[in-house]
Amino acid sequence: MLNVIATGLSLKARGKRRRQRWVDDGRVLALGESRRSSAISVADVVASLTRDVADFPVPGVEFKDLTPLFADRRGLAAVTEALADRASGADLVAGVDARGFLVAAAVATRLEVGVLAVRKGGKLPRPVLSEEYYRAYGAATLEILAEGIEVAGRRVVIIDDVLATGGTIGATRRLLERGGANVAGAAVVVELAGLSGRAALAPLPVHSLSRL
C-alpha cells in the first residue's frame, strides 16, 4: 500500500516538473529550449496558433478558430495552466458549448473540481433551465440540467474559448444564478476587445489570456 502511495506521489511530482519545464509564471518556453533561454507569453502563443476565418459562420463575421491552439500539446497545456490560475478557488467549472468544453474540462482536471456542461438548446434531457440570448449572428438558447446536478451555493467560474459581445457568458451566468450558484467570474482564451463584451458583463470579473 505504501509503495502504491509513494508511486502516486512520485508520478504527480514528475507531472508537475514536466509542466514547469515549459510554463513558468505565465511564460511559455519554446520547444527544445531550456529555462534559461528566452520565453514568450501565453498571449503570444494564443495569437500564433489562432486562425482567422473571414465570413464565418455568416458573411461579415471574422471567426477566431482556436482549433490549432487546442491541437498543439504545449499550447493547450499553457492555456490550461493559465486559465486554472484565474479560476483558482472555484469548486465547479462551467464550460460553454462547444469549444468551451475542451478548456473547461482541462481546467477542472487541473483544479481537481467538477465540470458542468452548458449546452445549446435541445441537447439535454429534460427537465432543464433555459436561457435565450443574442449573439453577433443571431439568437440562440443555452440550457443546464434542472435536476441531477446540485449547483446551489457552489462557487462557479465560467470558462469559454472566446468573449465577443458577452451574450453567451451573460446567458450562462443567468442560468447558473437561477440554479442558485455563486458565479465568481469568467475566464476566456481570447477576448475580442472591440465588441465590448467585458463592459456588457460588468460587474462580473472577466479574465482573458489574449485580447485581439
UniProtKB/Swiss-Prot annotation:
GO biological process: adenine salvage; AMP salvage; purine ribonucleoside salvage
Locations listed in the record: Cytoplasm
Keywords, in A-Z order: Cytoplasm, Glycosyltransferase, Purine salvage, Transferase
Species of origin: Mycobacterium tuberculosis (strain ATCC 25618 / H37Rv)
Pathway listed: Purine metabolism; AMP biosynthesis via salvage pathway; AMP from adenine: step 1/1
EC id: 2.4.2.7
Primary localization class, coarse: cytoplasm
N-terminal signal peptide: none
Record text on subunit structure and interactions: Homodimer.
GO annotations of cellular component type: cytoplasm; plasma membrane
CDD domains named in the record: PRTases_typeI (cd06223)
PROSITE patterns cross-referenced by the UniProt entry: PUR_PYR_PR_TRANSFER
Catalytic activity: AMP + diphosphate = 5-phospho-alpha-D-ribose 1-diphosphate + adenine
Matching InterPro entries: Ade_phspho_trans, PRibTrfase_dom, PRTase-like, UPRTase/APRTase
Domain of life: Bacteria
Protein name (Swiss-Prot/TrEMBL): Adenine phosphoribosyltransferase
Family in the record: Belongs to the purine/pyrimidine phosphoribosyltransferase family.
Role this protein plays: Catalyzes a salvage reaction resulting in the formation of AMP, that is energically less costly than de novo synthesis.
Sample GO molecular function, one term: adenine phosphoribosyltransferase activity
EC class of the enzyme, as a word: transferase
